[in-house]
Amino acid sequence: ESFERPVTAMGEVNSPLLPSKRKWKQHGQGGLWISDWLPNHARIADELCVLRSCVSDGINHAGGVCQMNTGSVFGGRPSLGAWATYGLGTENQSLPGFVVLKDSKSAIVNGVRCWGSGFMPAGYQGVLLEPGDEPIANLNRPRGVSRAQHERKLTLLNKLNRQHARGRESNTELEARIRSYELAYRMQAEAPEAVDLSAETESTRRLYGLDNETTQVYGRQCLMARRLVERGVRFVQLYHGAGSKWDSHSGMEKNHSRLCAQVDIPIVGLLTDLKQRGLLEDTLVIWGGEFGRTPMSEKGDGRDHNPTGFTMYLAGGGVKGGQTIGATDDLGLYAVQDKLHVHDIHATILALMGLDHTQ
């Protein structure tokens, strides 16, 4: 109910259908329908390519999240970010090529499998940055240890690691661990500045909603994502609602109203900022989840999982904005026009990055 108006049956005799509680308006040159759950998105309507007919095979969170990230409902395959990093490399040798940000200490469904490298070398998996003032724990040099002392310790550690690795060339996890130590050393010079938001102007902080208690957590994520992209990180993945907070089997009106308010301003701020800085043309932004919610009620005021017809959107990265693709049936339950399976979505994303999904 964010980008597609459901059918109403007001006035019909004995109709079980109720009208949506959302209010709808068309915005932008393309006349994109946006509900009052995301009022600030009206400002970026012409940047959005809304996919209304997404379909997945995952009926529960574990399978759905796994497929949306890896293309398979079963674990063991590389994540989309790992493929992007494998195919395109990184533009900054002092920062990870693939970074994951989350909004709370709560666990993400499937955990590291969402950003893992599967059967590829472990070095391509994402690096998780924790929420709060210290996204990367223990990155800075310990107090009382000089730079020269620190370098000598790391040199010895690298020598021991390389000796241990001889004869174990097939152990990609060991190689990834060695590379992670080397990357951590390089990150000590650049990462603290990359994740330090204090240098941002007040106007930029307001743009992302950092001045508002409701939006400041996700606003920090979005602003940090822009700073990482600006510094050459290839793939940045943001999680909002860690701990399945969007899973509104009950209390959907209250829950989704609160969650939409948390993300609306920060997302708009991110797209606006990327465009102002000339980064949006080369940065693909993808927004969505593992599935949608059914039009039928559950437990009176909730909705169940719906993998048969849901909405996502793309922006930037060469995407033509101000348009919608596909449609569900009148109830919003099944995709009926231009169905886009998760595999189609992944193929499109990889193509926009210049990668052939068949290779």
Regions found by a protein language model. Name each.
Residues 1-359:
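Ligand-binding pockets and gating/stacking loops
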